[in-house]
Amino acid sequence: MNQAVAESINKSLKSSTADYTPKGYHITELESDSIYLDEHFSGNAKIFHNPAVAVLYEQALAFEHGSAITSTGALVTRSGVKTGRSPKDKRIVKEPSSQDDIWWGPVNIAMDDLSFMINRERAIDYLNTQEKIYVIDGYAGWDPKYRIKVRVICARAYHALFMHNMLIRPANREELRNFGEPDYTIYNAGQFPANRYTKGMSSSSSIAIDFARKEMVILGTQYAGEMKKGILTIMMYLMPKMGVLPLHSSCNQARNNGDTTLFFGLSGTGKTTLSADINRELIGDDEHVWTDTGCFNIEGGCYAKCIDLSREKEPEIFDAIKFGAVLENVVYNEYSRKVDYNDVSITENTRCAYPLEHIPNAKFPAIAGHPKNIIMLTCDAFGILPPVSRLDANQVMYHFIQGYTAKVAGTEVGVTEPTATFSSCYGEPFIVWHPTKYAEMLASQLHKHSARAWLINTGWTGGSHGVGSRIKLAYTRAIIDAIHSGELEKIPTTKMDVFGFQVPNSCPGVPSEILMPINGWADKEKYVSTMHKLAKLFIENFKKFQDKASPELVAAGPILPQ
């Protein structure tokens, strides 16, 4: 439908009480264009198509319980019962065009086409009951060669603002008018539950992707992160088909020479915090693609954890939480509207989504050169891994496939020790192909572009959680500064027992006694037994990849004494 026809329909509607809108086309009072959604949409709802941020604020405050404006101008929202992702409820449709590519199993659970269509119809039926719905058109991927067009159709202003921030926004009204048909569409009816008796459902929540239909359907969860990670899953599938490597990583580069660094790590290990460096330009905090020409960000915004946030520790993130930012599930003072980032009474997974423009040192377009350094982040609550280690090529592949971090003991009675978590490629819930495919692509890129690789532990030292202490953020930043300056590469190393890491003997700004972990433990025997316990967990977890692993790759892991 061209612009002239759209304007003609708008003019007719404004001058007559009759509805001359072709079936499936909807007119919004806020925009001058029409938008074709789907033949299944009834046409009764008012459509807000890429509305201004202020409009979404007004809608959330007026119609969504729990919404408020904080003292810094951010919008507080509530995601309902679900305050985090539901990985056990994610499904991928098993269909001929993609079924041979996918790593089926507990990560990628198969769904049949009929179940997907039942959920799709259920979602659209729910959206059709709404007086208003929101449509956000945007892009995933800053490199025009690889970007995809994404359309989000949802019933909450909170979800619309979230995706307005996280997608790459059309530059102007003309670009939006020429957006055309999306490559992928997300139907978010998260307020409405899935039918638990539909074949393949594990609960009333469902997050389903169909690569043939190029659609994603969300039911039974209002947690906005499902949309963001759904797009990452789509890119994790599409990019290797185009010969480029998608990564769950953050990225920044030096202001003066374009020296680029990629940070890998699971949630809570420091990707967002450590990539937001005032002395470097931010490319992105979570999702990137490494191509033959360099790296590009998939997203138009950042999604930062807010627990214990302070301006002193993380000034760039703290100051980004202003008008236009979305704060999820935080607690605030009803009188002053100041947020208490230490209060986790709703959830520990408090989050904020804000556009890249909120970071003063963000680079536009969010594209960088080939990385000079690869940094793998882990939060080792066992207190065994060094604050920094230098990795060889096989160790990079091994630890990338393993994707280790550890969770601290919770509040449950009897739980006193850390729990090891392994997430392949530092993003197992989002990968689609077998992990070795991504690892082989990474090894190829590292070799081709001579990138150095490091493993950094942001977790505990001097003992496990409960005995030792958390490695200070200032020390981690000093390590990263020494990597960027090239100083750390020149410092002699000592090989660590069992794990075989090359550990620098010193680092500017870091106490030398914490660099080799055993030196910080008062109980040396306890250290050795804990190290052997952790090594066994590594060895056991790697067994599921051994059928596709070379002997050199297996040998890159921990080796216990006979």
Curated annotation (Swiss-Prot):
Signal peptide feature range: none
EC annotation from Swiss-Prot or TrEMBL: 4.1.1.49
Superkingdom of origin organism: Eukaryota
InterPro entries: PEP_carboxykinase_ATP (IPR001272), PEP_carboxykinase_C (IPR013035), PEP_carboxykinase_N (IPR008210)
Keyword Heme: no
Annotated keywords: ATP-binding, Decarboxylase, Gluconeogenesis, Lyase, Nucleotide-binding
GO cellular component: cytosol; phagocytic vesicle
Enzyme category, top tier: lyase
Family label: Belongs to the phosphoenolpyruvate carboxykinase (ATP) family.
Official protein name in the record: Phosphoenolpyruvate carboxykinase (ATP)
Organism: Dictyostelium discoideum
Taxonomic lineage of the native organism: Eukaryota, Amoebozoa, Evosea, Eumycetozoa, Dictyostelia
